[in-house]
Amino acid sequence: MPYRTRWFCVAVVVCLSAISASSYAQTAPGAAPNSDATYQQLRNIGLSAEAVTVNNFELKRDAATFLLRSGTVCFVAPVQGRVTGAVFVGDGNMTLDPPSPGEAVSLKRLTKEDKFSEDFSRLALRFTDSTYDQIKKGGTPASGGCDAGLLEDSQHTTRKKLNYNLSARILQDLLNAQQGGLFVAFVHGKHYDDKLMYFMDPDGAPGVAPEQVELTSYGENKSGTWASFNFSSEYRDGLGAGGEPNSRIHIEHQELDTTIEKSAHLTGKAITTFVSESSGLRVVGLSLFPTLRVDSVKAEDGQPVSFIQEDKNDDPDFYVILAKPLSKGDKFTITTTYNGKDAVLNEGSGNYYPIAREDWYPSKGGGLGDYTNFDMTFRIPKGMKMAATGSLLSESNDGSQNVTVWRSDIAQPLAGFQFGRMKEEDAKLTSPDFLVAAYANEEPPDWADKLRGGTMGNLSTVSMMKQPLSEAQYAIGLYTGYFGPLPFKRLNITQQTACTYGQSWPGLVWLPICSFYDVTVRHQLGLDFSDNIYWKVVTPHEVAHQWWGQTVGFESYRDQWMSEGFADFSASLFLQSAYGKNGQKEFLNFWDEERKSLTERNADGFRAIDVGPVTMGYRSSNSKTGNIGSHLIYPKGAYILHMVRMMLWDRQDGDQNFKELMQDFVKTYGGRAATTEDFKAMVEKHMNAQMKSFGDGTMDWFFNEYVYGTALPSYRFETASFDTDANGDVVFNVKLTQSGVDNNFRMLVPIYIELASGNIYFLGRARLVGNSSFEQKIPLKGLKDKPHRAIVNYYDDVLASSN
């Protein structure tokens, strides 16, 4: 489920907040965008005459320490009586000691040094905390002499490179009665990188929110996050895994009225009701696609509300400025009108491609953790069909427009749509009671239309939509049995013009157009992927996201492995079940490909299994490791759940224990975001006696190895022979060795035998700790014929090297 990104790899989380109650409405006449006087002062800020000389001055900001050995600090001009920035020229040093052990290891791996220590001679700072007072107190008055270009360079970086409106973020704190906690350092280093940024924000650092601290580089050819974590105090207080809540608002309801013309130009009106989750809130940040330009923002009484939205090519973050602050728990409603192109593309012949998936309306942004109720009206050209999230309440024609009205059955993390000149075919399920509707465009898009003729045929997908319809229908029934029922009763399976990826929103799936084509056409298009499994699993994977990502959200990029990994795992269930007698072969082939994805080196020479734990998410991708993130999150997340399934499986009840675990997880966390630790607690609730005794009553051993670690054991039979005892029963002589791990690594390793008939029989699980061996003579009572062979890890029960 890909996300549009800015300078980081997870969806942007600019802290939001909003309003309700006409008593707080803007009283001044409507103003042009970005016209707020205080904001303009921040936007055009420069250095003042105030400066101090510092010697061996230490400024500690959470895990970072800035030592200004000698030099001059010049401050920016005050705004609203507060100084929000400074530049330093001289001799300085920055050290970083992450409070998270995993981040400390990752930083050492990245720098190839035990300690992060960066010297610098130039430094720019922006802040809303006590930095000004501390530096002023620790220095002696000076006459200036700083480089004004340092401040200008930091402004250019945030606006042009990172597309992040730092001035608006500072305004949030300036208009709050309480002192802020924002601190941003632009470090021109001499050793690692001359373009480092240390970002500390109680609301969440933009690239890694809700985590508050981030060290990142932003050079042209060297970019990516070096380290990120919560405040050090949260780890000391036992909150480091999940962190303290730091959202400014919760959006309670969205009423969206959207018109999309034949040209794909979008015009929208959003009535957004939100609840303040902080006190003193005046500036609310919202996520809106950059090319959708805001025309106006109004309060409930119709009075205009001031707003910020810079040029689409710069830092176009959308902020609303309230006339008066909100208290925690206050509701506020705003109406935003906006329009623009490029949020939706006209791909020709009645095909449309929504580019803006999560920000085609003013939203909270930040992924799949906040759940909102939606009422939506869509107006599209007459003769076209609309498929959207939620339930269809009505459809009518109004002049030249097709008008549909939709409502979410429950609160959902996102809303979305697909439309065009489409055909629809439905399939009704009785168990569960569910409707699957498939949509295919009547004509191919322009890019495909140019390929018509010859061996390619006409590339029409209408006749081919029965397959994704039947796959989705089967997957819904299968997954309901494993994970429990969905909270809604309809799923729209649509075709998108993108060829090689799918995506899933609540009740709505976008499938790649090329998944509708057969093998011959895909070969002609050069889409012979090495594993070829992709085309078999793209539909069941995206359907599985109705549970993983939509019904159960994820708290942050640290937890996204559950969404993508669980969906990938679900696809393996589909292969095993839906392919009949070939299911076992497809299932084993799937896990073989997942392991290869983790253990084969990419073009940059890295293996996904080695670059970091799965909780690093897309942060594992950077200019050094390449685009390796998806090769970690999808297969590693899938393997983790697969291993849990196999540990819970037993001869008598099969998957029953696993089903109870997953259904409990969905029931407990449906309609909200879950964390990795939430899932761990759920596994511990349902673990069997063997798992419990092996881990002293917890699953720490397993999660430390595979979720928070990068372990990859190897297994080898030193001995695997069969004798017979005096009664003629087979005796299995086994010595199984575990290697390639540390001394604390432990695993329950499954052993199987293949009988002479070819049937596979599960013997049991060997308990292995560290680099050691399990050696035993096992009588197989009642078995007279010697088995063909013994097999370790037959179903890829344990993620291990292939030997």
Question: Model-derived features: where do they sit?
Answer:
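Hydrophobic helix-coil surface modules that form long, contiguous segments used
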Residues: 233-238, 242-271, 275-282, 287-290, ...
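Glycine/proline-rich low-complexity spacer/linker segments in large multi-domain proteins
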Residues: 241-245, 328, 337-378, 430, ...
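Beta-strand-rich binding/interaction modules
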Residues: 279-284, 290-301, 387-388, 696, ...
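N-terminal, polar/Ser/Thr-rich
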Residues: 26-267, 295, 366-368, 700-705
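Solvent-exposed beta-strand/loop surfaces of large extracellular or lumenal domains
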Residues: 63-67, 73-77, 81-124, 130, ...
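Zinc-dependent metallopeptidase catalytic helix centered on the HExxH motif
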Residues: 352, 369-370, 375, 473, ...
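Amphipathic alpha-helical substructures
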Residues: 278, 487, 630-734
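Acidic/His/Gly-enriched intrinsically disordered linker/tail segments
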Residues: 564, 568-643, 647, 669-670
